[in-house]
Amino acid sequence: MLAHVEERASTPGIEHMRADAMRLPGPYVAPLGAIWLAESNDGAIGCVALRPLPGGIGEVKRMYVDRAWRGKGVGRALLETLIAHARTLGYHHLRLGTLSDMAAARSLYASLGFAPIERYRADEMVDTEFYELRFE
């Protein structure tokens, strides 16, 4: 997760991500939250986290895949794992926000059934787009 923060270090508003990474596990603690780490023989190559929101909603946070591993199915595997786990926890839908310049991430979310929604968090950066996956 720290690699993601450093990769986007020049992005306005990145400070909240750095603070979040420094207080792990924070809101991602079980039983309603979780963190997954993808590893190769060389170490960590990706991560994703789940945290609870009010009303039976789970939030996907800190999705990151190392540049060298993008386009190889790592992000999809992480998200599919998170989605399956969220279902077992009883969440009825998932939400997430992603920066508008992350076209590959938006494409991945759409391929897994996430649809665009209105802004649900006021504290996210201005150029954040929001998505939701409903389990009903």
Question: What residues fall within each predicted segment?
Answer:
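Active-site acidic-Proline motif in GNAT/NAT acetyltransferases
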Residues: 66-72, 100-101
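Acetyl-CoA-dependent GNAT
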Residues: 1-61, 66-67, 79-81, 85, ...
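Short polybasic/polar patches that bind polyanions
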Residues: 70, 87, 110
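Conserved G/P- and acidic residue-centered "switch" motifs that form tight phosphate/ATP-binding loops
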Residues: 73-75, 90
